[in-house]
Amino acid sequence: MSESFKVCFCCSRSFKEKTRQPPVSIKRLFEAYSRNGKMSFDELLRFVSEVQGERHAGLDYVQDIFHSVKHHNVFHHHGLVHLNAFYRYLFSDTNSPLPMSGQVHHDMKAPLSHYFVYTGHNSYLTGNQVNSRSSVEPIVQALRKGVKVIELDLWPNPSGNAAEVRHGRTLTSHEDLQKCLTAIKDNAFHVSDYPVIITLEDHLPPKLQAQVAKMLTKTYRGMLFRRVSESFKHFPSPEELKGKILISTKPPKEYLESKTVHTTRTPTVKETSWNRVANKILEEYKDMESEAVGYRDLIAIHAANCKDPSKDCLSDDPEKPIRVSMDEQWLDTMVRTRGTDLVRFTQRNLVRIYPKGTRVDSSNYDPHVGWTHGAQMVAFNMQGHGKQLWIMQGMFRGNGGCGYVKKPRILLDEHTLFDPCKRFPIKTTLKVKIYTGEGWDLDFHHTHFDQYSPPDFFVKIGIAGVPRDTVSYRTETAVDQWFPIWGNDEFLFQLSVPELALLWFKVQDYDNDTQNDFAGQTCLPLPELKSGVRAVRLHDRTGKAYKNTRLLVSFALDPPYTFR
């Protein structure tokens, strides 16, 4: 069978179409666990245990594999598996490199500060930060992808009689606040029952804060989590907060109170003048306090900004854990000057990182800087694209994709603080071999990659993690093949902090004259990675999984490493 490509109006080129044939290495693997070209239940169970590392698998597990490939009609009449059925099993969703989606397997009973949380930035924007449209659509999409922290910017409307959602001081449009709140309510627990946190960037006067409090109370009712005390040593756990929505923002009056000079020395004329003004405003504020008290009482996680260099935003009140926000530039400053202090602070308190203001194109930054210092809420523009977003999506494929990933022990040890800048010894080596891939012929038009020939695929593969572990490689190019076979090289990744490592793949079609064409990507959290030969499903630029396109890859850690 051949495949034809038009070269000009009257000519065409034909290529012999290659079928889905198992690579030689897979054939040898099958032969090692079969007899006379057929594999029995017991032999398949031995393969699953010895090669795939499924030590606790039994005959029920093997029967599920049989059923998963039964429709391929490649069984021996006695129920034995032929090579092609074995090959289809290896490429099936049953053979994923990660635990099944929806299977939460981390301890969810620790304080909220012990988890990385899937976090969005300016969650209502559909595009750039300057003049794009505001809508509930990106909020819905984010929640349905597992995002658990939604940000809303609240401003008075032009009439000053209601709050609206918009990116202030830009040309972006506004969205109705009630629509946003309802969208969150309707989609908050689509992926998992673990809590959703709404971070409010509040630019409202007390009267509108009171109005927002009524909207929140009416919309969420019993779903709304309320603090039972102003003093507590730790945040509640995700398990305790199941089905709850938490509000996080700066409490009213905090700004003015922070401006009042508290000192025992004789104040200057300038300070005295400011104190009089501030105290007068505070008195006026007290008159309106009855209006805003409901708003203040709804704030489950008190927030503070980290913008003033003279203010110690990492001071830890043992009775009042808080959330501190800082942009990526301020994070870099903190990392250089107070890295271990930041790690200590995040053991009890929450830290939210957000993109710097110059990222007007809604691009993103390296999330690992925040994660390696314990920051729980590394906020991303979910409407953006690119490698950094793929890494973010990869991190939260962990723990069943529930939106919460337990931080590794190294970030929670109160006695030996983790220092990401320190050079650690190699703990283990990840060995990866990419055998083959398939599905592009089903997910793409036959001229998508090249008008005149089948595609020339190659794979880039690398580690995202601490600087010492960050490295990448690429395979050779498989020329003119819809079903490329590589498998000659084994890629070795020496890992000093495997707990924070993610493995990324990017497939491209090689083009000699123009930019290489994108052909799929994915990112896998190393602590979740299963050993053995696995089917790695690829995703498009936005993170949506292709229906058919996969790589067949083997993974092994040498020596084996225990993550949790």
UniProtKB/Swiss-Prot annotation:
Annotated residues that bind Ca(2+) 2 are located at: D450, D509, D511, D517
Question: Where in the numbering of this chain does the EF-hand domain appear?
Answer: 19-54
* GO CC terms, sorted: plasma membrane
Q: Where expressed (tissue)?
A: Expressed in leaves, roots and siliques, but not in flowers.
Cofactor(s), names only, from the UniProt record: Ca(2+)
Sorted alphabetically, which PROSITE patterns does this protein's record hold? C2, PIPLC_X_DOMAIN, PIPLC_Y_DOMAIN
GO molecular-function terms, A-Z: metal ion binding; phosphatidylinositol-4,5-bisphosphate phospholipase C activity
Known EC number: 3.1.4.11
Membrane-topology annotation of the record: Peripheral membrane protein
| Amino-acid positions noted as binding Ca(2+) 1 in the UniProt annotation, renumbered to this chain | D450, D456, D509, D511
Q: Which residues form the C2 domain?
A: 406-539
Q: Kindly give the Pfam families that the UniProt entry links to this protein.
A: C2 (PF00168), PI-PLC-X (PF00388), PI-PLC-Y (PF00387)
Localization recorded for this chain is: Cell membrane
Q: Which GO terms describe its biological process?
A: intracellular signal transduction; lipid catabolic process
Q: What induces it?
A: Not induced by environmental stresses such as dehydration, salinity and low temperature.
**Active-site residues (renumbered):** H121, H167
In this protein, which residues make up the domain named PI-PLC X-box?
106-250
Q: What does this protein do?
A: The production of the second messenger molecules diacylglycerol (DAG) and inositol 1,4,5-trisphosphate (IP3) is mediated by activated phosphatidylinositol-specific phospholipase C enzymes.
What is the protein's name according to its record? Phosphoinositide phospholipase C 3
Q: Which organism is it from?
A: Arabidopsis thaliana (Mouse-ear cress)
